[in-house]
Each structure stands twice: as structure tokens, then as C-alpha cells.
């Protein structure tokens, strides 16, 4: 078993995404977190079990938002609450994992950088000459121990698949733990609602990470006739009913 001595207690006492839940089977699968070798597998009852390599004692774990969460320490609370995920008209769009040769903290910082839009996501999330980052509000919400940035806005030529042209997009950023951050942005088809983009960062080594981005987007493509079916499936999921489903078969 690899030592976790290089990881301080503050980093150990966090919840981390380490894999997509659909990629975990009954066969033990190696993984790595904070320089520590792990194994993950599904137990006979479908429960995901995460252990340190060479140690049969199960680590705390959760299956949440389509991902496996675990910790090497004692987190002060449960993983981040994302209430929008329970909304029936949301599309679940996983976009990873992506191996990044950088510190997990740097990956989060890059995600929070508005200024890169016109230069990295040219003609999609930004374009010259619209390069100015306008003033916005940043605060640490001590009562929930989160960092929030609000009143962010940026001109975007193609802010979303549902956008029909360039719009000034409103943003909110939410950092819920050192390696978990969420972005809320204007949804072109739903006034007063937000598309939600999450970045769950898995620090593998001090200078290597796996990024697990996922989007929960308001769905314009689901036919009205299917909305009842979608809601029924979500209701079953809330109750934990899986008998006869593809999830159970896996």
C-alpha cells in the first residue's frame, strides 16, 4: 500500500469522485487517489466497495450523481448537494474522465478563469473583441464554507446547443470543496433557470489529476409525450427500485 504521508489532513478529509459508477463491475478495478493505490468493485448486492490496495477494510463511499465518491479521511459532511440533478427535464452529460498533468488545485483554478473564454473556446464561449471580464462579486459563504462568484457575465457566440445566436451569458461559480466546483449558466430556453456544469477533480499525484466533468442541462429534445416516462424513471430511482432494469443487470 502506498503511503499517504504527503497528503495533509485537510486534503484527506474530503470527498472525491474517483470513477463513473457505470464503469465499476464485480471485477476489482485499480484506481489511485492522493498517491494511494485503491481498488473498487461491486459487491454481490450491487453496492460499490472501495478499499486501499492490500487492505480489505472498506473506505467510506457513496454512489451519487452517476459517480463513485470516496475519502481517505473523515469529511465533516456528505458530498456536495446538487438539487438540480433531481429535476425531471435535465439531461445527464458526462464528459470524462480526462487525465491532466497538473495539480488538482490548478485544474480548479483554470475552470474558474473567465478570461480564457475568447482565446481557448473561440467562437463558442467567447470571441474577440469581446475579451473584457466585467466586475463581479466574490464571497466566502462562511455559514456553508463555500466560495461563490455571482453577477458574472460574458458575451458568447454559442453559449449552448440550444442557443440560436450570440448572447450575454450570466454565470455563477460555486466551489464547495478544494477539488469540487460547479458552474451555473444562463439556459437559453428556460428563463430563471440555470444549466449546471460540474467539475469533480481527482488528485492522483501532486502534479497529476483526473478531471470528471459532467453537465446537467435543461433538455429541449425530450418529446412532451416522454416527460411522464422520464419522471417515472426518476421516481423509481429515488425509491431505489432497480429490479428488471439495465442498472440491476450491470
Question: Where do the model's predicted regions map?
Answer:
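N-terminal pre-ligand scaffold of iron-sulfur
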Residues: 1-52, 57-64, 70-72
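C-terminal catalytic domain of Rieske-type non-heme iron oxygenases
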Residues: 3, 45, 76-250
